[in-house]
Every structure is written in C-alpha cells, then in structure tokens.
Design a protein with these regions (language model features):
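Electropositive, gly/pro-rich neighborhoods at or near active sites that engage anionic ligands
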Residues: 2-144
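Short, hydrophobic/aromatic alpha-helical segments in well-folded domains
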Residues: 136-140, 150, 163-166, 223, ...
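Residues at the starts of beta-strands that form the adenosine-phosphate
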Residues: 145-146, 173-177, 251
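Structural motif
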Residues: 146-148, 232-233
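Gly/Ser/Thr-rich loops at beta-strand to alpha-helix junctions
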Residues: 152-161, 183-185, 239-243
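Histidine-anchored nucleotide/phosphate-binding helix
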Residues: 153-172, 177
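Short connector loops at secondary-structure junctions
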Residues: 176-193
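C-terminal functional extensions of proteins
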Residues: 180-181, 194-279
Length: 279
C-alpha cells in the first residue's frame, strides 16, 4: 500500500507528541523527508524504533497489556463460541467477531478500553459488499489445500482461534499455518502469545522473523516467503498487514477496523468501521 504525505505528517506528529528530544525528531524528519517512494509504514516504524532506543531509551513494555487482553478474551471464549455456533452462518460470524478483536491496538489508537471493545460484538452482520467477498472466500477455500493467517494483536488472536475452528469445520481439508511477529513489538502477537491462547492446536505457527509490525515480503526469512508463495489462501488481519502487504503482488483477503484517517478516508467510512476486502 502506497505511503502518502498525509501518513508522513501523521507519523511525525505522533512522534512529537511522544517526546521533545530535538535530535530524535530531526532524525525522524530526515527519514520521512527522504523516504523511498516504495517504502511501507512498517519499514519506517522499524527505523523509528531503532532511533527511539538510541536517543530516548527502550520501547514501552506492553507485556502486561498483552496478557491482560489475552486473558480477557480467553475468559469470554466459551460464550463467544456459543454465540458463533448458534448463528445462521458460524464461519461468517466468526470472521466478524475476529475482526472486532482488531480494536485491541495500542499502536494505532491513543487509548484502548474494554467497554468499546465489548460493544463491537453487538454487530455481527456483514454488509452486502462484504457478503460478496465472503462468497468468493468460501468458493476459494472449497478448492484450496493450504491457508495462511497473518495475525495482528494479542487478545484478537483468541478470536482468530475461534475463526479457525469454524474454518476447519467448513473446510476440513485445509492445512492451516499462522504467522505471528518475530519478536515483541507493541501489543502484537508473538509465538509465545500464540501458544498461550492455543492457536498452535489449530495449525502450524511460524514467525515473520523480525521485530516488525506488518508483513513486508522482501524482509521476511526464506521460510516465511515460501509459506506465502505456496499458500492457496492468505487471510491477513489488521491495518499494518494491509499497509505492508497489499499491492505487493500476492492475492489475499484482508479484514480490519478502520482506526486512522488514512483508512477512514480511503474507504470513506466512520472510525472503527470493519472492512472485509479481497485484493
């Protein structure tokens, strides 16, 4: 996905709100002003984080928040599973509910609160446009042998697990692989988190090999590239995966909540509107 001048301005403003360290902010501005045309936000954030550790100190430790939301959604798991299985189309419902978990994003949102998160479960219906994408998704899954899930946040991955349960029920021949982050970055899910919530019971877990929020194909280890290249279906969660992976030459389905102005304006929807797209 093309990185725009408005994204650059937003990223710089967010750094200014975080610190008044003049040397750090000058370096950030230099990176943004001289960025390559094809760079992704995920790559820029990696550079920012390296500078943060050099000029300011370690990045915020969100391990407590990660565990808090993993535990919160795990405590809701049985009730959510019952709601999914009682619905007219459990797979469709599970996709919408898994997307609701995309709200748990301490990088994109200034604040995350449990009431807003829980309120997102009130609407589990797909729009007419989303149903067209869903029909395409099901048609392709019925013919596929391999399925790759690109995950995003902690807490959200519990809902991803419930989605994968329904996927395996509908399409039992699918071989499932789940890709998580290669190291702690914000509240994104890692291998440890995936095992903690039980995602490893539904598929093979691999990592993107980096401390990177997103999926930048050219920066992935060979194993991750091979899995992407050989997966019949790629299902990517969250804004960061869309920003870094869409338009890079691989067909994929994406679902996310629109949390920043770029997505709100691109899709012309209110904040926190869910999207299900195929590209």
């Amino acid at each position: 996905m093309k990185f725009s001048d408005s994204c650059a301005a937003c990223m710089y403003d967010r750094q200014c709100a975080k610190t008044d360290n003049a040397d750090y902010l000058k370096k950030i501005k230099d990176i943004l002003d001289n960025r390559p045309a094809d760079i992704t936000s995920s790559e820029l954030v990696m550079q920012f984080n390296e500078l943060h550790e050099k000029y300011i100190g370690p990045l915020d430790d969100l391990s407590a928040e990660k565990k808090e939301y993993n535990d919160l959604v795990l405590s809701m798991e049985d009730d959510i599973r019952k709601d999914i299985e009682a619905s007219v189309d459990p797979l469709a419902t599970s996709i919408i509910m898994a997307r609701s978990g995309n709200y748990i994003d301490f990088a994109a949102l200034d604040s995350v609160d449990k009431e807003t998160f829980i309120g997102l479960f009130d609407n589990t219906k797909m729009s007419e446009t989303e149903m067209e994408v869903y029909d395409s998704f099901c048609r392709q899954c019925s013919k596929a042998k391999s399925f790759l899930l690109l995950t995003d946040n902690c807490g959200e991955i519990v809902l991803d697990k419930l989605m994968l349960e329904q996927l395996k029920k509908r399409f039992p021949n699918l071989e499932i692989t789940v890709m998580v982050r290669g190291a702690d970055i914000y509240n994104d899910a890692t291998l440890e988190d995936a095992k903690y919530v039980g995602l490893d019971t539904l598929g093979t877990i691999i990592t993107n090999g980096r401390r990177m929020a997103g999926t930048v194909y050219k920066m992935l280890p060979d194993k991750a590239k091979s899995v992407i290249d050989n997966s019949d279906i790629i299902f990517a969660k969250g804004q960061a995966n869309y920003e870094s992976f869409a338009g890079e030459g691989h067909h994929a389905f994406y679902t996310f909540l629109c949390k920043c102005d770029l997505f709100i304006n691109r899709f012309n929807v209110p904040k926190l509107t869910g999207m299900f797209v195929e590209e």
